[in-house]
Amino acid sequence: YPSLRAHAREGFPYPEPEKLKSIVKRGAPVIRTWLRAGNGFSVPYPADGRDSRSCDPVEKWVGEGKATEASAHLVQLLEQDDPRPLWIAVWGGPMDLAQALWQVRHKHSAEASRRMISRIRYYQVSWQDTGAVWLWENFPELFRLQSQFVSRGIYREGPPALRDEAWLRANVVEHHGALGASYPAAGANGKHTLQVKEGDSASFLYLLAPGLSDPNEPEWGGGGGRFRHFDSTSSRFVDARDRNPSSDEVDRESTWTMGRWNEAIANDFAARMNWCVQPPSAANHPPVAHLDGDASRRVLRRTVRAGETIALTAAGTTDPDRDRLTYRWWLYSEPGTFEGELRLEGQDTASVTLVAPVVSTPATAHLILEVTDSGQPRLTSYRRIVLTFTPR
């Protein structure tokens, strides 16, 4: 902790260990048994789907008198007079969230319940337990990201050399303190091997891509993948698809929405593990990317008319370690509605220009700025601008 604290970005200190321990709450001891793929409990998405586990029925853990420390804590957070969204990353099972929302619905007025539920932003990795099914069926109004294949992109896509045992030993497990030494082996078919799995990390990484994404816009994509509306009447989102350069299989196009960022994620992971044991002068830190004079970490937007020349710059971008920086501008096609090509002049420099294309109706294009340093490991920072092209 003392070493990590020395690497904290100004204004964003690492929380004290005791603070983290104080907010860990015990949840329901739901019993789940691994079976085989497709042999577990029924799930509503995809159609006729089944999980890979058996699980206690939801009635055992949701209802009157079934509150846990965890569910009570969630209710307490929702009852606070706080306008901010409450993000809930679910990767171990949402039964306590199900109990919390049962209590919200049964112990509060309809208006208070509606207001509390509207604050929730919920990322669900796979189905995990029967509580996830119950929430889907009973709370369709929840802002929910339901990952089927997206979250698997962290271990199915990208350079294999960034997720094998040799990489883990060199960058995480060995000579990286107590945290690195505790990295778990992945189990499969009774075998335990040291490899990057991180299959549930998407639910957290989704919130950790400042400048690249906006968590409130699942269709835009980012470090935790990209999603699309499940239907036109709810706030539920399911796997989207990006063109995968290695495969046109549906699941591989979904995993690629996360996998396309894997090299940057792996290098960031390695750098942070170095922070555990190295002083700031010996470790690498990410660049601070500026976009058109904006030093914040928000996504920018601009509306331009067809035929108008657009000039964008990364001037002002800095690196904490004074490393040499390289730049790359590129069109992230899938989130936008513009379906053509954009000619980017200077796409490998700090400034880029393009001409807004002719369109018959307004269309959007997502332009990404990547800034990568020359340190070890090489770290990348992102900015995004959403351009809306309008007719003349």
Show which residues each predicted segment covers.
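Extracellular and select intracellular beta-sandwich modules with Ser/Thr-enriched
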Residues: R378-I385
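Surface-exposed, flexible coil segments in extracellular/virion-facing regions
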Residues: L331-V355
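Short, solvent-exposed loop/turn segments at the edges of extracellular beta-sandwich modules
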Residues: T372-R378
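Extracellular interdomain linker/stem segments of modular secreted and single-pass surface proteins
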Residues: T388-R392
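N-terminal acidic, glycine/proline-rich low-complexity segments
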Residues: Y1-A311, A315-F338
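Hydrophobic/tyrosine-rich beta-strand signature of extracellular beta-sandwich/beta-rich modules
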Residues: L367-L369
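Short, surface-exposed loop/turn segments at beta-strand-coil junctions that are enriched for proline
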Residues: V355-T361
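Surface-exposed loops/turns
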Residues: A306, D321, G346, T361-P362
